[in-house]
């Protein structure tokens, strides 16, 4: 009996583009993922400058936004997972932002 093992690799980001409506992730294997920015409220509420201040870490497996305290896994984006942040947590974060920006 033969068994065929399919080798899979964790998706890895090569480049990120963010506009007012979407997050686009170019993968190392040539694919591009595009997700609505509204799925990630901290990115949605962040300024263009904050959204564009990101770092691809973990050999391309994660994207980190220091200014927004946000981390997304490339695998999660590919799987269509939205932010799991609670409304209570998001509300607190937004209030803290308003206080800092006064």
Where are these regions (language model features)?
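Motif-centric detector for short Cys/His coordination patterns
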Residues: 1-102
